[in-house]
Amino acid sequence: MDLFALLRAGVRSGDTPDIGGSTDDRWRELYTAASSQGVSALVWDGIRRLPPESQPSRELRLRWAYNVERIERRYGQQRRRAAELAAAYAEAGIRTVVLKGLAVSRLYPVPEHRPCGDLDCFLCGDYERGNRVAEQVGAEVKRDFYKHSHIVFRGLTVENHRFCTAVRGSRRAKRFERHLQRLLAEGPL
C-alpha cells in the first residue's frame, strides 16, 4: 500500500490508485503517516476511489472519516475568520492579497481537505495600519519579526507580511520585492 499513490489519487481527479491488498496493520501505519504529515483528508479522498474490498476496515474508515470532518470544520472556521478580518481591512480601505495557505487550497479538488496552519497576507503598503485594524477588531498582534507580524484573530493565526519575499541580505531579492510590489500596486492580479 503506497501513501503516495493514495495521495496522488486524492489530489488528481479521475485517478484511481493501483493498490493491492493490505493488512490492518499496514492501514494503521498509513493512517498514522498521513495524519503526521497533515495529508489525512487528501489520502482519504484517494481511499474513497478504491473498490470497497480494497479499503481499510470499517473501524478505521470511521476513525478516518471523523478526522476528515474535523479538518473540514476547522477549514470552514478559518475561512469565516479570514473573511471577517478581510472585511475589516476592506472597510478601512486596505487591499488584502493572500499569499498562500487558504488561497492555495482553492487549487485542490476538495479545498476543505487541504489543511493550513495560518493565513499569510500582504496589505499592499498598509502593514502597520493593518496591525492596528486587527487590534481594533479584537485580535492580538505581535510585531516581533522583521518580515511579518503574527495576528491571532478569533482562533485564526495570520501572518501580516511587510514584504512578499525574504529580502534580508540579498540585492536580487530586494529588486524582486520592489517589482512584486509595483505589480500589486497596479491592481488586481
What are these regions (language model features)?
Residues M1-G117, L123-L189:
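Conserved NTP-donor binding/palm subdomain of two-metal-ion nucleotidyltransferases/polymerases, i.e.
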